[in-house]
Design a protein with these regions (language model features):
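Acidic, glycine-rich loop-and-strand cores that form catalytic or ligand-binding grooves
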Residues: 111-126
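C-terminal intramolecular chaperone/auto-processing assembly modules
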Residues: 150, 154-221
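Glycine-rich, low-complexity segments
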Residues: 65, 69-106, 110-113, 180-184, ...
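Stable alpha-helical elements in mature extracytoplasmic
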Residues: 100, 112-115, 140, 171
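Active-site-adjacent substrate-recognition loops and nearby beta-strands
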Residues: 53-58, 96-106, 122-135
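Glycine-rich, acidic and aromatic/proline-enriched surface loops and short helix-turn segments
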Residues: 118-121, 141-151
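Periodic small-residue-enriched repeat registers in elongated scaffold domains
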Residues: 1-84
Length: 221
Protein backbone atom coordinates (compact mmCIF):
# COMPACT_ATOMS: atom_id res chain seq x y z
CA UNK A 1 0.00 0.00 0.00
CA UNK A 2 1.41 3.39 -1.01
CA UNK A 3 -0.38 6.67 -0.29
CA UNK A 4 1.11 10.11 -0.97
CA UNK A 5 3.58 11.91 -3.18
CA UNK A 6 6.58 9.76 -4.12
CA UNK A 7 5.40 7.04 -1.73
CA UNK A 8 6.65 3.57 -2.62
CA UNK A 9 5.76 0.19 -1.10
CA UNK A 10 7.84 -2.40 -2.90
CA UNK A 11 7.50 -5.63 -0.96
CA UNK A 12 4.90 -7.99 0.47
CA UNK A 13 2.58 -6.28 2.99
CA UNK A 14 4.68 -3.11 2.95
CA UNK A 15 2.97 0.22 3.75
CA UNK A 16 4.18 3.68 2.74
CA UNK A 17 2.18 6.78 3.72
CA UNK A 18 3.36 10.35 3.20
CA UNK A 19 5.76 12.23 0.97
CA UNK A 20 9.04 10.79 -0.31
CA UNK A 21 8.72 7.63 1.78
CA UNK A 22 9.77 4.10 0.89
CA UNK A 23 8.72 0.83 2.50
CA UNK A 24 11.15 -1.55 0.84
CA UNK A 25 11.12 -4.49 3.25
CA UNK A 26 8.44 -7.14 3.65
CA UNK A 27 5.90 -6.19 6.33
CA UNK A 28 7.67 -2.85 6.82
CA UNK A 29 6.06 0.58 7.29
CA UNK A 30 7.30 4.03 6.33
CA UNK A 31 5.32 7.13 7.32
CA UNK A 32 5.75 10.90 7.18
CA UNK A 33 8.48 12.46 5.04
CA UNK A 34 11.89 11.38 3.78
CA UNK A 35 12.17 7.99 5.46
CA UNK A 36 12.93 4.49 4.20
CA UNK A 37 12.88 1.00 5.68
CA UNK A 38 15.86 0.22 3.42
CA UNK A 39 14.84 -3.33 2.65
CA UNK A 40 14.66 -4.47 6.28
CA UNK A 41 11.67 -6.70 6.92
CA UNK A 42 9.29 -5.92 9.78
CA UNK A 43 10.84 -2.50 10.40
CA UNK A 44 9.00 0.78 10.89
CA UNK A 45 10.19 4.33 10.40
CA UNK A 46 8.45 7.68 10.87
CA UNK A 47 9.82 11.11 10.02
CA UNK A 48 8.86 14.77 10.11
CA UNK A 49 9.35 17.37 7.36
CA UNK A 50 12.39 19.04 8.96
CA UNK A 51 14.85 17.80 6.32
CA UNK A 52 15.11 16.46 2.80
CA UNK A 53 17.69 13.88 3.83
CA UNK A 54 16.25 10.38 3.88
CA UNK A 55 16.47 8.61 7.25
CA UNK A 56 16.98 4.89 6.74
CA UNK A 57 16.40 1.86 8.92
CA UNK A 58 19.39 -0.39 9.68
CA UNK A 59 17.88 -3.51 11.28
CA UNK A 60 15.00 -5.90 10.76
CA UNK A 61 12.06 -5.58 13.15
CA UNK A 62 13.35 -2.21 14.35
CA UNK A 63 11.80 1.21 14.83
CA UNK A 64 13.26 4.63 13.97
CA UNK A 65 11.60 8.02 14.34
CA UNK A 66 12.72 11.59 13.63
CA UNK A 67 10.97 14.64 15.06
CA UNK A 68 13.25 17.68 15.18
CA UNK A 69 11.21 19.46 17.85
CA UNK A 70 11.06 16.44 20.12
CA UNK A 71 8.52 14.01 21.51
CA UNK A 72 5.80 14.55 24.08
CA UNK A 73 4.04 11.55 25.57
CA UNK A 74 1.13 12.00 27.99
CA UNK A 75 -0.49 9.33 30.13
CA UNK A 76 -3.64 11.19 31.16
CA UNK A 77 -6.39 12.99 29.27
CA UNK A 78 -5.49 16.41 30.73
CA UNK A 79 -1.93 16.14 29.33
CA UNK A 80 -0.40 16.96 32.73
CA UNK A 81 1.43 13.66 33.32
CA UNK A 82 4.03 12.25 30.98
CA UNK A 83 7.54 12.57 29.60
CA UNK A 84 9.33 14.79 27.07
CA UNK A 85 12.25 14.15 24.76
CA UNK A 86 12.94 17.73 23.79
CA UNK A 87 14.66 19.00 20.65
CA UNK A 88 18.36 18.04 20.64
CA UNK A 89 17.93 16.09 23.90
CA UNK A 90 19.35 12.60 24.39
CA UNK A 91 17.22 11.47 27.35
CA UNK A 92 13.59 11.54 28.45
CA UNK A 93 12.57 14.18 30.98
CA UNK A 94 9.59 13.56 33.25
CA UNK A 95 7.06 16.34 33.79
CA UNK A 96 7.99 17.71 37.22
CA UNK A 97 6.42 21.18 37.39
CA UNK A 98 5.50 22.01 41.01
CA UNK A 99 2.28 23.58 39.71
CA UNK A 100 1.13 20.13 38.58
CA UNK A 101 1.72 18.46 41.97
CA UNK A 102 -0.07 18.24 45.32
CA UNK A 103 -0.11 16.42 48.70
CA UNK A 104 3.52 17.12 49.57
CA UNK A 105 5.08 15.23 52.50
CA UNK A 106 8.59 15.64 53.95
CA UNK A 107 10.92 12.65 53.83
CA UNK A 108 13.24 11.43 56.60
CA UNK A 109 16.64 11.33 54.94
CA UNK A 110 18.22 9.21 57.69
CA UNK A 111 15.41 6.71 57.31
CA UNK A 112 16.06 6.54 53.58
CA UNK A 113 19.76 5.88 54.22
CA UNK A 114 18.89 3.07 56.62
CA UNK A 115 16.54 1.48 54.09
CA UNK A 116 19.16 1.72 51.35
CA UNK A 117 21.77 0.13 53.60
CA UNK A 118 19.44 -2.79 54.26
CA UNK A 119 18.37 -3.25 50.62
CA UNK A 120 19.97 -6.20 48.79
CA UNK A 121 22.00 -5.21 45.72
CA UNK A 122 22.91 -7.53 42.89
CA UNK A 123 24.30 -7.93 39.42
CA UNK A 124 21.86 -9.86 37.25
CA UNK A 125 20.41 -10.53 33.80
CA UNK A 126 16.89 -11.08 32.52
CA UNK A 127 15.83 -14.69 32.02
CA UNK A 128 17.01 -15.95 28.66
CA UNK A 129 19.57 -13.17 28.08
CA UNK A 130 23.22 -13.83 27.31
CA UNK A 131 24.96 -13.95 30.69
CA UNK A 132 28.24 -12.85 29.11
CA UNK A 133 27.05 -9.62 27.48
CA UNK A 134 23.76 -8.48 29.04
CA UNK A 135 24.39 -8.13 32.77
CA UNK A 136 23.00 -5.28 34.92
CA UNK A 137 23.44 -3.64 38.35
CA UNK A 138 20.69 -2.76 40.77
CA UNK A 139 17.96 -3.76 43.22
CA UNK A 140 14.89 -5.88 42.65
CA UNK A 141 11.53 -4.15 42.27
CA UNK A 142 10.15 -6.17 45.19
CA UNK A 143 12.90 -4.93 47.53
CA UNK A 144 12.58 -1.33 46.33
CA UNK A 145 8.81 -1.40 46.78
CA UNK A 146 9.11 -2.98 50.24
CA UNK A 147 11.42 -0.14 51.30
CA UNK A 148 9.79 2.83 49.58
CA UNK A 149 6.36 1.72 48.37
CA UNK A 150 4.33 3.57 51.02
CA UNK A 151 4.63 7.17 52.24
CA UNK A 152 1.80 7.59 54.76
CA UNK A 153 -0.78 8.74 52.22
CA UNK A 154 -0.72 6.01 49.61
CA UNK A 155 1.33 3.67 47.47
CA UNK A 156 4.35 4.55 45.37
CA UNK A 157 4.97 2.26 42.42
CA UNK A 158 4.48 -1.50 42.52
CA UNK A 159 6.48 -4.64 43.25
CA UNK A 160 7.35 -5.47 39.62
CA UNK A 161 8.53 -2.09 38.26
CA UNK A 162 10.98 0.62 39.37
CA UNK A 163 9.99 4.12 38.26
CA UNK A 164 13.15 6.03 37.37
CA UNK A 165 11.71 9.30 38.70
CA UNK A 166 11.15 7.67 42.11
CA UNK A 167 14.57 6.01 41.94
CA UNK A 168 16.18 9.40 41.26
CA UNK A 169 14.17 10.99 44.08
CA UNK A 170 15.32 8.37 46.58
CA UNK A 171 18.93 8.90 45.50
CA UNK A 172 18.70 12.70 45.85
CA UNK A 173 17.14 12.37 49.31
CA UNK A 174 19.97 10.02 50.31
CA UNK A 175 22.60 12.40 48.92
CA UNK A 176 21.05 15.29 50.85
CA UNK A 177 21.09 13.22 54.05
CA UNK A 178 24.76 12.37 53.49
CA UNK A 179 25.54 16.05 52.88
CA UNK A 180 23.88 16.89 56.22
CA UNK A 181 26.03 14.25 57.89
CA UNK A 182 29.13 15.67 56.23
CA UNK A 183 28.24 19.21 57.30
CA UNK A 184 27.68 18.04 60.88
CA UNK A 185 31.04 16.26 60.88
CA UNK A 186 32.73 19.40 59.53
CA UNK A 187 31.12 21.50 62.28
CA UNK A 188 32.21 18.98 64.93
CA UNK A 189 35.73 18.97 63.50
CA UNK A 190 35.81 22.77 63.55
CA UNK A 191 34.73 22.83 67.21
CA UNK A 192 37.26 20.13 68.05
CA UNK A 193 39.97 22.13 66.29
CA UNK A 194 39.05 25.25 68.29
CA UNK A 195 39.16 23.29 71.56
CA UNK A 196 42.49 21.77 70.57
CA UNK A 197 43.95 25.20 69.80
CA UNK A 198 42.70 26.54 73.15
CA UNK A 199 44.16 23.53 74.93
CA UNK A 200 47.51 24.05 73.20
CA UNK A 201 47.46 27.72 74.21
CA UNK A 202 46.74 26.76 77.83
CA UNK A 203 49.50 24.17 77.81
CA UNK A 204 51.93 26.71 76.39
CA UNK A 205 50.87 29.21 79.05
CA UNK A 206 51.36 26.62 81.80
CA UNK A 207 54.76 25.68 80.45
CA UNK A 208 55.77 29.33 80.40
CA UNK A 209 54.47 29.76 83.95
CA UNK A 210 56.42 26.70 85.10
CA UNK A 211 59.55 28.00 83.41
CA UNK A 212 59.26 31.32 85.24
CA UNK A 213 58.65 29.57 88.58
CA UNK A 214 61.68 27.36 88.10
CA UNK A 215 63.73 30.43 87.26
CA UNK A 216 62.56 32.22 90.42
CA UNK A 217 63.32 29.18 92.58
CA UNK A 218 66.78 28.93 91.07
CA UNK A 219 67.57 32.55 91.95
CA UNK A 220 66.37 32.09 95.54
CA UNK A 221 68.82 29.27 96.05
Amino acid sequence: IAIGKNAEANFNSAIAIGNDVEASGSYSTAMGSYVSTSGFAGSMTIGDRSTTTVMETFVTNGYRARFANGYRLFTNSAATIGAFLNANANAWAALSDVRLKENFLPVDGEGVLYKISAMPQYTWNYIGQDVKTLRHYGPMAQDFYAAFGKDGLGEIGCDTLINQQDFLGVNLIAIQALEKRTSAIKEDNARTKELLELTIQRINALEEENRLLRKQLKHKR
